[in-house]
Amino acid sequence: MTTTTEARALPRLKQRYRDEIKGQLHEQFSYGNVMQIPGLTKVVVNMGVGEAARDSKLIDGAVRDLTAITGQKPQITKARKSIAQFKLREGMPIGCHTTLRGDRMWEFLDRLLSLALPRIRDFRGLSPKQFDGNGNYTFGLNEQSMFHEIDQDKIDRVRGMDITVVTTATTDDEGRALLRALGFPFKEN
């Protein structure tokens, strides 16, 4: 009994990382071991919806948008503590986030770099200073309409999002070199 399994196509960015970028980084930083070459671990996309404390239906729009953008259902973030000034109670939904790993992560980054970021009006590049000291990079987008998965007519309100790219790099310079090689458009100082 033989079964034929179709090999899924490798994401374009992952193929480029394996074929070209790993070799470039190995030469640039002259690692002694191939396991020291920095790679991507995960991408976390977070959408905070502070207004959901007053109107709990707003979280549904954020979940719908994030599902369309990332291709997987996000987890709803709930308030840890009650804060009277914000009329916030413990356990109220205040946002949603999703963690992308594997092929979904590579496909999301490919869409982000080749389709979404070029659609931003007056885009001058990402800030190269937003690394955390360990090679991880976080940046914010102030509207979801730049993703082509979102139907412009069905947007109920403009929502921003935070995107964190977690790498195995140990320093900011290694992380910056990895992300620049992947095609992240950093501003030149």
UniProtKB/Swiss-Prot annotation:
Gene3D superfamilies: 3.30.1440.10. One of its GO terms (cellular component) is ribosome. GO terms for molecular function: rRNA binding; structural constituent of ribosome; tRNA binding. It comes from the Bacteria. Keywords: Ribonucleoprotein, Ribosomal protein, RNA-binding, rRNA-binding, tRNA-binding. Disulfide bonds: none annotated. GO terms for biological process: translation. InterPro entries: Ribosomal_uL5, Ribosomal_uL5_bac-type, Ribosomal_uL5_C, Ribosomal_uL5_dom_sf, Ribosomal_uL5_N. HAMAP family: Ribosomal_uL5_B. Part of the 50S ribosomal subunit; part of the 5S rRNA/L5/L18/L25 subcomplex. Contacts the 5S rRNA and the P site tRNA. Forms a bridge to the 30S subunit in the 70S ribosome. This is one of the proteins that bind and probably mediate the attachment of the 5S RNA into the large ribosomal subunit, where it forms part of the central protuberance. In the 70S ribosome it contacts protein S13 of the 30S subunit (bridge B1b), connecting the 2 subunits; this bridge is implicated in subunit movement. Contacts the P site tRNA; the 5S rRNA and some of its associated proteins might help stabilize positioning of ribosome-bound tRNAs. Belongs to the universal ribosomal protein uL5 family. This is Large ribosomal subunit protein uL5. It comes from Kineococcus radiotolerans (strain ATCC BAA-149 / DSM 14245 / SRS30216). The lineage of its organism: Bacteria, Bacillati, Actinomycetota, Actinomycetes, Kineosporiales.
